[in-house]
């Protein structure tokens, strides 16, 4: 099961990097964006209302 999840993550990461490169971004830009998204989610976690 773990290897299946890892393969999905690897595939998703690869697709994200390909998409970023197609619009002229590098891996550093993607990593910086992901870190800023994670930080903003942690700050706003209590304010977020789930909509299922």
Curated annotation (Swiss-Prot):
A GO MF term: protein dimerization activity
Keywords, sorted A to Z: Transcription, Transcription regulation
PROSITE patterns (alphabetical): SIN (PS51500)
Annotated ranges, domain Sin: 1-38
SUPFAM superfamilies: SinR repressor dimerisation domain-like
GO biological process terms on file: regulation of DNA-templated transcription
One Pfam family cited in the UniProt record for this chain: SinI
Keyword Transcription regulation: yes
Knocked-out gene: effects: Defective in biofilm formation.
Record function comment: Required specifically for induction of eps and yqxM operons by antagonizing SinR. Regulates SlrR activity. Controls the initiation of biofilm formation.
SUBUNIT field: Component of the SlrR/SlrA complex.
This protein's name: Transcriptional regulator SlrA
Source species: Bacillus subtilis (strain 168)
Gene field: slrA
């Amino acid at each position: 099961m773990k290897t299946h999840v890892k393969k999905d993550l690897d595939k998703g990461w690869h697709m994200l990097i390909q998409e970023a490169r197609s619009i002229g971004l590098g891996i550093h830009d993607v990593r910086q964006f992901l870190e800023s998204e994670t930080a903003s989610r942690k700050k706003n976690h209590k304010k977020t209302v789930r909509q299922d």
